[in-house]
Amino acid sequence: MEAAATPAAAGAARREELDMDVMRPLINEQNFDGTSDEEHEQELLPVQKHYQLDDQEGISFVQTLMHLLKGNIGTGLLGLPLAIKNAGIVLGPISLVFIGIISVHCMHILVRCSHFLCLRFKKSTLGYSDTVSFAMEVSPWSCLQKQAAWGRSVVDFFLVITQLGFCSVYIVFLAENVKQVHEGFLESKVFISNSTNSSNPCERRSVDLRIYMLCFLPFIILLVFIRELKNLFVLSFLANVSMAVSLVIIYQYVVRNMPDPHNLPIVAGWKKYPLFFGTAVFAFEGIGVVLPLENQMKESKRFPQALNIGMGIVTTLYVTLATLGYMCFHDEIKGSITLNLPQDVWLYQSVKILYSFGIFVTYSIQFYVPAEIIIPGITSKFHTKWKQICEFGIRSFLVSITCAGAILIPRLDIVISFVGAVSSSTLALILPPLVEILTFSKEHYNIWMVLKNISIAFTGVVGFLLGTYITVEEIIYPTPKVVAGTPQSPFLNLNSTCLTSGLK
């Protein structure tokens, strides 16, 4: 009986480890021992061995769907109602569907190119940066072939920027929501105090938003000291449940409190559209989980079907919540729809707590990418006894950088748009079509494929340039927000109890 239980327990442990491993983004195994890639070509690297799974060890179709949903649903979803405001009630949803279709198509492109290059270079799997590097090697242009290693570095750079940007967004999100919950609790105490002692009313006070960010800093540092994602399995499961419950409560609120939407603008001003683009691309930037999931799927031939179904669900969720959220709150919509929920009802206050818990746990998962790209190259230069101390120091430093970024730009909507325009557009829209051109230019040249890919990449480049320009301009010269009873000011008032500062 005991012998029979042991394999079952081992199998359960293996499945748990797989569930966490597929959440690892596309990290490429790098050689820090001075050997070349050619010397390693016939050897399976540790990461490659990890992906050589038989049918019993791989993940199922349903598990693949679940991981696709986990990899795409986060703070970007809650910021989409404001994105619809920046585009218009008609143009916004149409554009959101369009960007979703292009993003999914680029995911398919990346998978197809990875398969071709794996066969060409006899590799079991390839990460994102290696796919770009090998695509440059097989291109017909010698100048790109000589700079193939440069392509790998560019992708790694944007992966680091993107993921650290996500982490900065998470810190702003945590601070905004916890601040609102805390102030709602204090206001309820003030109301009770005033009702019992009307002759001595209590003064409303508000703590600076950046103080909340600093309060989260030590807890986040301790969280990222957990180096193995499998050790976060329980927390990750609870985070997924809490975020799912929060979304259900948000949906029922916006559906039950829908005012007349006829006065909403069909199309917003052109200057706000780049902000919409950045937020939308930020939300759809789940390309980092595509190849790991495909590599670990039992029936990898069914992955395109899983990708279409999963991203179809994600797109439907995005469009419905974004549209309903904007229709519900109109121009009062904020950087996260959770901030528009009533502060005097604890059911909706609990939504902010539950979703904040989910985002807090997700921080460590997103942080895994820059940590695995940056840390090995630095710690390899230290003696063994100093490596762990050095690693913890680097982790603390990187977390502090994300916190500093959040403090410098404490506006959730602007941070999301900036990260989406700068790095997410590069990884999700610009690089995949260019990689397809390079990969198949010698095999089956097709002028329509080239035109299609150039159009997608051009869209990404335009969004990158305009989105970056508009968000930087908004950071330097923020649009004034008029609050009842206060004069119009071009400066942000982070101490505003109404939380209108830092949010549009």
UniProtKB/Swiss-Prot annotation:
N-acetylmethionine found at: 1
Transmembrane parts of this sequence: 87-107, 154-174, 206-226, 231-251, 273-293, 309-329, 358-378, 389-409, 414-434, 456-476
Subcellular localization: Lysosome membrane
The keyword Hydrolase is annotated on this UniProt entry: no
Membrane topology recorded in Swiss-Prot or TrEMBL: Multi-pass membrane protein
Glycosylation sites: 495
Main location: membrane
Catalysed reactions listed for this entry: L-tryptophan(in) = L-tryptophan(out); L-alanine(in) = L-alanine(out); L-proline(in) = L-proline(out)
Any matching Pfam family: Aa_trans
Swiss-Prot/TrEMBL GO biological process terms: amino acid transmembrane transport; L-alanine transport; L-proline import across plasma membrane; L-tryptophan transmembrane transport; proline transport; tryptophan transport
Protein family (similarity comment): Belongs to the amino acid/polyamine transporter 2 family.
Quaternary structure (record): Interacts with CRYBA1.
Protein name as it appears in the record: Neutral amino acid uniporter 4
Species whose genome carries this gene: Homo sapiens
Taxonomy of the source species: Eukaryota, Metazoa, Chordata, Craniata, Vertebrata
